């Protein structure tokens, strides 16, 4: 088995440079897959020490682990959409931001949130070419009912996944448009 050594001092320097270049724009640390194999909690701790307090994960168990490890005030976005009632209830209990990628997602979440008498904090996922999930750019009209008629959903953000950002600039620019 291979072992990786992460120089957290260098990581902190890199994060400081990233924060400086972001010039006040919020940064989300994507820590899916156990922090990409480097450890969810240790990587979240380094990010928090550097000033990054927004985390994105793909599993409910990761949201729970962050909360149990004391990351209670930090924003945690569940990147993977879900219509499973048990997952939605737990995400609401954990005060997670929940991804909405379709009208079905929104309808189910609105119902679960209404049953719990809470308003779900959500981010809308737009599919700009990854093909995994999300509203297509041509489906923007489907977002209006979420804002207009779903009283138990609050939309606080919108995001996409530029899957080839570092290796295919032409495709990335096309996705962004």
Short names for language-model regions:
Residues 2-6, 10, 23-177:
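Active-site-proximal beta-alpha core segment in soluble small-molecule metabolic enzymes
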Residues 11-14, 18:
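Alpha-helical packing segments of well-folded alpha/beta enzyme cores
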């Amino acid at each position: 088995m291979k072992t990786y050594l992460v120089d957290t001092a260098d990581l902190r320097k890199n994060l400081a440079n990233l924060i400086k270049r972001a010039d006040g724009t919020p940064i989300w640390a994507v820590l899916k897959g156990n922090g990409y194999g480097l450890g969810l909690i240790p990587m979240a701790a380094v990010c928090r020490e550097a000033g990054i307090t927004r985390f994105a994960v793909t599993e409910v168990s990761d949201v729970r682990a962050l909360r149990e490890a004391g990351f209670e005030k930090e924003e945690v976005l569940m990147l993977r959409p879900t219509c499973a009632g048990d997952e939605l209830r737990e995400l609401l209990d954990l005060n997670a931001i929940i991804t909405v990628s379709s009208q079905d997602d929104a309808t189910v979440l609105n119902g679960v949130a209404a049953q719990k008498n809470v308003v779900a904090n959500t981010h809308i996922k737009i599919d700009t070419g990854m093909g995994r999930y999300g509203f297509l750019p041509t489906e923007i009209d489907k977002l209006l009912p979420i804002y207009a008629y779903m009283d138990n959903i609050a939309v606080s953000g919108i995001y996409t996944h530029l899957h080839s950002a570092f290796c295919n600039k032409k495709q990335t620019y096309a996705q962004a448009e």
